[in-house]
Regions:
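Positively charged n-region of N-terminal signal peptides that target proteins for export
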Residues: 1-4
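Flexible loop residues that form catalytic
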Residues: 9, 31, 63
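Hydrophobic h-region of N-terminal signal peptides that target proteins for export
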Residues: 10-19
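Active-site-adjacent "subsite" loops/lids of carbohydrate-active enzymes
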Residues: 23-37, 114-179
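Aromatic- and glycine-enriched glycan-recognition loops and surfaces
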Residues: 35-53, 79-103, 167-168
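Catalytic domains of carbohydrate-active enzymes, especially glycoside hydrolases
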Residues: 42-68, 179-180
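Aromatic-lined carbohydrate-binding/catalytic grooves of carbohydrate-active enzymes
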Residues: 55-88
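Glycine-rich, aromatic-flanked loop segments that form ligand/cofactor-binding clefts
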Residues: 56-60, 92-148, 184-189
Length: 189
């Protein structure tokens, strides 16, 4: 019941934000822009450009399909490096939130749920820490296989039927809600 209440609250917050007029939303992908968004002045520059273009809402991707997050977490691995680039140590999320709010923009956390591994680079919880939690898929002529054994599958998913997986994902969401002043959360996948 408690879990349902939290999810209902998050959905309500998101709906209220979008119902207040014509929104223009920009999704800021954390992997594609990892290096670009690795400096406070660069973040402020891009938020300024979004505001100048009439964007009213930002969705900041903070948990991508590797399952790594862009903040220090008690639950998930933190993405500090991507494509041989090491991000300098600074408060990435609050830099975005402050810049967006300074322009009166709404900012949501974008979070991939149950997507916790990227097969192309072999990164994510399904490859190491939570290998036993990976989803099992039916593959014609091969039967049931763990997602990490399926060729050509770029995104690896955790098994949402497992209670420990549900708790893990909810703990990450709660952690974000407790620690950051986002205006809402967009759940992806």
């Amino acid at each position: 019941m408690k879990r349902l209440s939290i999810i209902s609250l998050l959905l309500w917050i998101g709906m209220v934000a979008f119902a207040t007029g014509k929104s223009k939303v920009m999704w800021l992908d954390c992997s594609a822009n990892f290096q670009r968004f690795s400096y406070p002045d660069s973040i402020r520059y891009y938020v300024d450009k979004c505001h100048e273009a009439g964007i009213t809402h930002l969705v900041l991707d903070i948990k991508d399909n590797t399952g790594e997050v862009l903040y220090p977490s008690k639950y998930a691995a933190q993405k500090k490096n991507w494509k041989n680039f090491d991000r300098p140590d600074f408060d990435f999320i609050n830099t975005f939130i402050k810049a967006a709010h300074a322009h009166g923009m709404v900012i949501f956390a974008g979070m991939n749920i149950f997507a916790d591994g990227q097969n192309i680079v072999k990164r994510g919880a399904v490859f190491d820490k939570h290998k036993k939690w990976q989803a099992i898929n039916y593959v014609p002529r091969k039967g049931l296989l763990p997602v990490t054994e399926i060729e050509g599958k770029p995104t690896m998913f955790l098994n949402p039927a497992l209670k420990e997986v549900q708790k893990y994902e909810i703990d990450i969401i709660k952690e974000v809600v407790r620690n950051y002043a986002f205006d809402g959360i967009m759940l992806d996948r």
